[in-house]
Design a protein with these regions (language model features):
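C-terminal membrane-associated helical module and adjoining short loops/tails
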Residues: 117-223
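Multi-pass membrane catalytic core of lipid/isoprenoid biosynthesis enzymes
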Residues: 1-7, 48-106
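Active-site His/Glu-centered metal-binding helix of metallohydrolases
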Residues: 11, 37, 41-45, 62, ...
């Protein structure tokens, strides 16, 4: 069952690339986000069923490269092409992003297995891919005014550097481990999503998570 969920994420990634090729960027972004939800589900299902394995870990990493490395890069590249940005800059930013994602996954797979998964070294490739997809979706919803087009290459490179960095991020599962935090967070997100828009709320939450790791690292250096 967990492997079927993982392969479903790969289907989402392939569909996203095809949709980008056909100019359906909004649907492509939605497919990447669907892959993100599936990626969050497969590991938990494997642990719940007691079938977690090294094979599952390697399979998940390979699928992550496509779902959150290749697909978001292709999406951003195609989104920025008509927006008066030099193709070489877009290409370089997207390549940096994919390299950062592959590096992050390779390093993660070499780390010794630990009983606690409360933190991760470097921003996860899944969160990075979801962030890029959300940025594109939100910008298209708000007529390209939410995030300046000129900032997209820099944002893409920053995410690449965060993935390759040693900045520690709390695992999302540990953040919502306490029941009251989970219920309060879901309730607040649901209210905001109804009031504003689902992708914008998701983008704000993801952006806050990315910024939290940076702020905590900066605080640790200045202490």
């Amino acid at each position: 069952v967990p492997s079927l969920i993982t392969f479903s994420g790969l289907v989402c990634a392939f569909s996203a690339v095809l949709l980008v090729m056909n100019g359906e960027l909004t649907m492509a972004g939605a497919c990447i986000l669907a892959g993100y939800l599936l990626d969050a589900l497969d590991g938990g299902v494997a642990r719940f069923l007691g079938v977690a394995s090294t094979f599952g870990l390697q399979l998940d990493s390979l699928v992550d490269v496509v779902t959150f490395g290749v697909a978001p890069s292709v999406l951003v590249y195609q989104y920025l092409q008509p927006l008066s940005i030099r193709p070489a800059i877009i290409w370089a930013a997207c390549m940096c992003y994919m390299i950062g994602g592959v590096f992050r996954l390779a390093r993660f797979n070499l780390l010794p297995a630990k009983g606690s998964h409360s933190e991760s070294m470097g921003l996860t490739i899944s969160t990075s891919g979801a962030t890029l997809a959300l940025c594109v979706l939100s910008n298209r919803t708000y007529d390209h005014r939410l995030i300046p087009a000129s900032a997209f290459p820099a944002l893409t490179v920053v995410l690449a550097l965060l993935m390759a960095s040693r900045v520690r991020y709390p695992a999302l599962a540990s953040v919502f481990r306490r029941r009251w935090v989970s219920l309060a967070g879901l309730a607040a997100a649901a209210v905001l999503a109804i009031w504003l828009s689902p992708q914008l709320v998701w983008l704000v939450l993801t952006g806050g998570y990315v910024s939290f790791g940076l702020a905590r690292a900066a605080y640790g250096l200045l202490r």
